[in-house]
């Protein structure tokens, strides 16, 4: 099985909340697709609550588009990580990490402005696979933590696992 890019970085040294360029790739037509690791919590130390991350999934994707799309950037998708420590964001373009962090801050501020659970977009059985598994309060708690902590930048070269470490880990 091929080693995925996300498993070549040392998760024990990741800062959170933090932005990281997880991958860039070129389409056959020459567009650049950038995948960002938007790490909300430190791996293996904390996780986002089930209802909180689900509510953020509904809110964050729209808010990030409001703040980041434009001038050569178009978000394709924002999806929660299976480990529940953050989100992956795929987009067309190459925005600077600080621009992504700024949009993230603005999006968390937007989350705090949502007035009631019934204001969560697509919160119904027709548009959501588990529409009863939401908590605006938990999403707001996550947003408050992110805003209080500040958002840093994780760099791949600083987090890269050595070839010898990758080989050792593949033997386990």
UniProtKB/Swiss-Prot annotation:
It comes from the Bacteria. Binds 1 Fe cation per subunit. One of its GO terms (biological process) is quorum sensing. Its EC number is 4.4.1.21. It catalyses: S-(5-deoxy-D-ribos-5-yl)-L-homocysteine = (S)-4,5-dihydroxypentane-2,3-dione + L-homocysteine. Its cofactor is Fe cation. One of its GO terms (molecular function) is iron ion binding. Pfam families: LuxS (PF02664). Disulfide bonds: none annotated. Fe cation binds at residues 54, 58, 128. Homodimer. Belongs to the LuxS family. PANTHER family: S-RIBOSYLHOMOCYSTEINE LYASE. Involved in the synthesis of autoinducer 2 (AI-2) which is secreted by bacteria and is used to communicate both the cell density and the metabolic potential of the environment. The regulation of gene expression in response to changes in cell density is called quorum sensing. Catalyzes the transformation of S-ribosylhomocysteine (RHC) to homocysteine (HC) and 4,5-dihydroxy-2,3-pentadione (DPD). This is S-ribosylhomocysteine lyase.
């Amino acid at each position: 099985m091929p080693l995925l890019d996300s498993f070549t970085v040392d998760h024990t040294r990741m800062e959170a909340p933090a932005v990281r360029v997880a991958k860039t790739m070129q389409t056959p037509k020459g567009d650049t697709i950038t995948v960002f690791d938007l790490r909300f919590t430190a791996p293996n130390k904390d996780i986002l609550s089930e209802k909180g991350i689900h509510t953020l999934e509904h809110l964050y994707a729209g808010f990030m588009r409001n703040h980041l799309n434009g001038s050569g950037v178009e978000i394709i998708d924002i999806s929660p990580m299976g480990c529940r420590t953050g989100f992956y964001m795929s987009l067309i373009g190459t925005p600077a990490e600080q621009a992504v962090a700024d949009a993230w801050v603005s999006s968390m501020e937007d989350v705090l402005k949502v007035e009631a659970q019934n204001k969560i977009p697509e919160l119904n059985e027709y548009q959501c696979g588990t529409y009863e598994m939401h908590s605006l309060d938990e999403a707001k708690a996550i947003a408050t933590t992110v805003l209080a902590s500040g958002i840093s930048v994780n760099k791949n070269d600083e987090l890269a696992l050595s070839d010898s470490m990758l080989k050792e880990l593949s033997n386990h």
